[in-house]
Amino acid sequence: IAARTLHRSAVAMMGLLGLDPVWVSCPAASREEEGIVGICLPPSPQSVEAALREHRDAAAVYITSPDYFGQMADIAAIAEICHRYSTLLLVDNAHGAHLNLFRAAMHPMQLGADLCADSLHKNLPALTGAAALHMADPDMREEALYAMSLFGSSSPSYLIMLSADMALEQMEGGGVEGMTRLAQWVHEQKGRAARRGYQIVRTFLCDPIRLTVGFASMGCTARQFGEWIRLRG
């Protein structure tokens, strides 16, 4: 069972393994009160449970959270539903490797996910390609290593691995304080953008350091707005 907001690599994996996905709809925001009009909202716990109720033989539920725009699914509620149906919850947390640096539980592994993939290079200071796979059950480790041997390179980049270690060391040194300051700044900018009439992400759960602004209601495109910013330094 997968939400339609998944990454194309997951679709490719399903094709290679011959998996038959059951899609969970992710309706787009239709009103500014919901968020940026036209952007798909995260899958709801209710839609996931409806799919599980109809497909009780599902091997897993696959969710992307947070998405590219910073919108986050209710992972805690979805995890509770998945486990009630004896189904694994897999979370693509590519844009959320930093979420465990906040005092409130926000990382999928803190909220009940069974497997979770983080891209360390998106929001942490690591080289492109640095990633981590988290497992709630240590017994999954051998199967995960076998799968990685099939789909991964036999000549990994030691520079990437070193950058991952250095990024984690840096986050342990002052990551919590740095992320807290950044989240406060983003919160202030969201307020300024909203007061000026811009559409912003308004989902109940959202990435504290992601600032996504819609420009359609202002009569310009993101490209035009970007050029306007560049001209003003």
PLM features: residue spans?
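Conserved PLP-enzyme active-site core in the AAT-like
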Residues: 1-202, 219
